Design a protein with these regions (language model features):
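Serine-esterase "nucleophile elbow" of acetyl-processing enzymes
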Residues: 56-125, 129
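Surface-exposed cleft-lining segments at the edges of enzyme active sites
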Residues: 82-87, 112, 179-197
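Hydrophobic anchor at the start of a short beta-strand
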Residues: 105-107, 138, 212-215
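Well-ordered, non-membrane alpha-helical segments in soluble/globular domains
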Residues: 121-125, 190-203
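Conserved, well-ordered alpha-helix/loop/beta-strand core segments that scaffold catalytic motifs
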Residues: 142-143, 197-240
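N-terminal secretory targeting modules
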Residues: 1-76, 134-135, 149-188, 204, ...
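Short, structured active-site "lid" loops
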Residues: 132, 138-143
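Short, solvent-exposed loop/turn segments at secondary-structure junctions
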Residues: 83-85, 113-117, 145-149, 219-224
Length: 240
């Protein structure tokens, strides 16, 4: 399975569309933090050892209920990266799936593996524009990914759409050789701090003005280095 996914955006897009296919993964190495995990558990006794994990996606390429299901059902809405997508997990073991089942809600999980914070902002804009008027979510969760993931877009003229790709600090060759990333994230991290300051405020305010409860979480990999004095909430590290 390909977990660092390119997303596309067209003039008539209702959501970012993920370039992915349904498939089966039996490689435990795809699990986030697998090398650290295997030091702590007995793989011979672990439930997931040698299991084949199916990945099935909806009409927009997301691993969740169909977006059309919100016409008739209440739902929980989740944004995030591979932690929320459930990379290396059965669908029923993903936290958003468990929450939806516990609360008797549909599971609308817009997590994109390998993505940064910017695609969450883009999808929030699109979702708010195209689906909130149908039915508001009961709850919204933002799982903040690694804060040094940078999303950049290129325009495909022949197909008239934007490709949005994410560069990660883990891939140093691509990351520090990009002039924009080097200038605004490494030599001077002003662009990163700009997103730290404004993106959480925006994501929270969208739902707060609609009276929808919103929760901000991270799995110990988002470091908000520049926080607005007007930010009244914390991004909760649920690993601690």
């Amino acid at each position: 399975m390909k977990f660092n996914m390119v997303t596309t955006l067209k003039e008539d897009s209702k959501l970012l569309r993920i370039d992915t296919e349904d498939g089966i993964d039996n490689c435990m190495g795809s699990i986030p933090n697998y090398n650290e995990l295997k030091k702590q558990i007995d793989l011979n006794k672990w439930y997931y050892t040698d299991k084949k994990i199916p990945y099935v996606h909806n009409e927009y390429g997301y691993r969740c209920d169909t977006i059309d299901s919100i016409y008739e059902n209440d739902y929980i809405l989740t944004f995030g990266c591979s932690y929320s997508y459930g990379e290396g997990l059965f669908y029923e073991d993903v936290y958003s799936t468990k929450l939806a089942k516990k609360l008797d809600l549909k599971n609308i999980n817009l997590a994109i593996p390998g993505s940064g914070i910017s695609p969450q902002v883009y999808n929030t804009i699109l979702f708010n524009n195209n689906f909130n008027k149908i039915r508001l979510p009961k709850y919204v969760i933002y799982q903040y990914p690694n804060d040094y993931r940078v999303s950049l877009s290129t325009y495909e003229e022949t197909r008239n759409h934007l490709d949005i790709d994410t560069f990660t600090a883990g891939d140093i060759k691509e990351y520090d050789q990009n002039g924009y990333i080097f200038d605004y994230y490494l030599e001077n991290d002003g662009e990163k701090k700009l997103k730290d300051l404004l993106f959480p405020l925006y994501l929270n305010n969208v739902w707060e003005t609609l009276n929808v409860p919103v929760f901000h979480i991270t799995f110990s990999d988002y470091n908000q280095e520049f926080k607005s004095k007007y930010q009244s909430f914390e991004i909760l590290d649920i690993v601690d």
